[in-house]
UniProtKB/Swiss-Prot annotation:
Its EC number is 2.6.1.100, 2.6.1.101. It catalyses: 2-deoxy-L-scyllo-inosose + L-glutamine = 2-deoxy-scyllo-inosamine + 2-oxoglutaramate; 3-amino-2,3-dideoxy-scyllo-inosose + L-glutamine = 2-deoxystreptamine + 2-oxoglutaramate. Its cofactor is pyridoxal 5'-phosphate. The keyword GTP-binding does not apply. SUPFAM superfamilies: PLP-dependent transferases. This is L-glutamine:2-deoxy-scyllo-inosose aminotransferase.
Amino acid sequence: MPVHLAINNGTPVRTRPWPVWPQPARGALDALERVLRSGRWAISGPYRGIESAERRFARDFAAYNGVAHCVPAASGTASLMLALESCGVGVGDEVIAPGLSWVASASTIVGVNAVPVLVDIDPRTLCLDPAAVEAAITPATKAVVVVHLYSAVADLDALRAVADRHGLPLIEDCAQAHGAEHRGRKVGSVGDVGTFSMQHSKVLTSGEGGAAITNSAELARRMEHLRADGRCYPDTAPAPGRMELVETGELMGSNRCLSEFQAAVLVEQLRELDEQNALRRRNAELLNTLLAEQGLRPQATSPGTTSRTYYVYAAELPDDAFVGLPITTVTEALTAELGFPISPAYAPLHTNRLYAPASRRRFALGEEHEKRIDPARFHLPVCERLTRRLITFHHAALLGDESDMHDIAAAVAKVLRHHGELRA
């Protein structure tokens, strides 16, 4: 019997290399050298009479997103914790979050001693289902965290309305959506606070890093204190050689600051973000058409989305394809055909082994609290069903050309056609 699939030692669809990520911006190397020679490598270093890279990035990123304030931070996780604490979330409060997301969307809530309430998702967008959010609200609910997942913008019209109706802050987790827009506004600017990750894989990256944006001067000031050991920037510049942070005693914080090297890289990477996003979008739109012709359902976005950002490309397999096969068998076969990783979706948070609050003694705050933060108590049927049917891949593959999209489609067609080999 002839062998066709590469995973069974057949000939792969493609052996050529794929685009790599990160791709350094044209000015990144010079920017790093300027910081290296500046005598100031952190915001806690001595003021040298010129604007720090961190303040420059904060100014540029706020302007890019059309908001008044940006507070850079060490990571997306740190940014989300700043947002939660600045909005007053604390011990025992409930925070509604999606059941399908990266683990930090829930672990940060536990990290401020609050209780994540995981709710199901919209099957088309894979983002928070507004009806499920409304049904989950209780007198203990303190905030709603909405994640713009993979390449979709969540239904911000409905979610903002739900939050406003119940007097709750809406926190947008935009770790995967830099530059995406809802009704002409950048994501992150619709909620009370928007948070971002600049980790290695993100479309805007400095290796590690994060930021929180807001139009509220009060929330911004709280986040400044929370990320810099209770210190904030002064109203006037200090004398050269003095530290450009002042101790106010307003709010105890911790060190979650971005370094000057990371900030300098982000200033340059931001200049190229829109161009890269446009290329990803063009290629993804072509791939959407090619895969839909084969019966796959590419991830949709909500009404009101005016611009998508593709961090991860996701598509649902046809209902009658690969019945009885684990999704990992399918993704491994596609990976062998293409030479880059095709992966399942995230595991739903109520079954995700990375989200295990009971493994940390610091969260053992009494039997009742431990029951409330146990993720196994949630029932998320849409998350469970879809994660058995979704294939995903990283945005780097979308930085190529149309021939690359045809290769991906050809690999999917080949594995669909010869799926019997996966059962042998």
